[in-house]
Amino acid sequence: MRFRQLLPLFGALFALYIIWGSTYFVIRIGVESWPPLMMAGVRFLAAGILLLAFLLLRGHKLPPLRPLLNAALIGLLLLAVGNGMVTVAEHQNVPSGIAAVVVATVPLFTLCFSRLFGIKTRKLEWVGIAIGLAGIIMLNSGGNLSGNPWGAILILIGSISWAFGSVYGSRITLPVGMMAGAIEMLAAGVVLMIASMIAGEKLTALPSLSGFLAVGYLALFGSIIAINAYMYLIRNVSPALATSYAYVNPVVAVLLGTGLGGETLSKIEWLALGVIVFAVVLVTLGKYLFPAKPVVAPVIQDASSE
């Protein structure tokens, strides 16, 4: 029974670790033939429309106004700002691996916001995050950190927005189930398309086949599947656990680079992979391996009863 209860958790984490880890590489392919804000907007609009149509055909109804607006706000924070900044940065020639490294700061910001919101955090989570960040540094110590610094700043801003949205999203009422993801993607898509028009983005030529395939992959797998998995996590587990994917994503990005891009890894970088996986185990399984001890409140007798 215990294993069956954990299946949704493991499935959601797998979607985030593997699918989102590959999106950095796919975004880089897409922005070669799409303007960045436009590509992100098309991605989320397509995903949101498809998911909403599916839900409405299945008999689901639109949520009340308050949860709907809450979901739109979370979509703005997580997708329009969080993911949009990554897309713009990669268009500015920030390497996908560097993008993944900067996004790895999300769990650190998440724990900080968690403390501000009064959410209890475990010492083991802090230890896991510290080890994970150390692994990220090791992973890139032998690489070429020649990415655009302004692009890195954009990703950092997106990471802060994503972390705040993750914590805030766990404290407010959101639509039930996949309806939350549909509204968030629609809202983000609209905002990104407006931003694209304001920025004066235009298609100078028809995107290539790889560009269309990249948007399709990002819409279906990177948005509909992975984002709904993420929303499941932030509603059901601690924010630190929900953002632990940030440790695995750089690993997946590096493996894609070695497998498809002809890159090589040094010994210290391979060692870093093991350190990062260990950190993920601490963050994701620590609450089950080392559950918090229940606090027994002392019994205080009422003086009037004596």
Swiss-Prot record:
Record-level GO cellular component terms: plasma membrane
Biological processes per GO annotation: response to toxic substance
Membrane topology term: Multi-pass membrane protein
Domain (EamA): residue spans on this chain: 18-141, 160-285
Segments on the Cytoplasmic side according to the record's topology features: 1-6, 58-67, 115-125, 170-173, 228-239, 291-306
Location in or out of the cell: Cell inner membrane
InterPro entries: AA-Vitamin_Transporters, CO/AA/NH_transpt, EamA_dom
Principal location listed in the UniProt entry: membrane
Alphabetized Pfam families for the sequence: EamA
Record topology, Periplasmic segments: 28-36, 89-93, 147-148, 195-206, 261-269
The protein's name in its UniProt record: Uncharacterized inner membrane transporter YedA
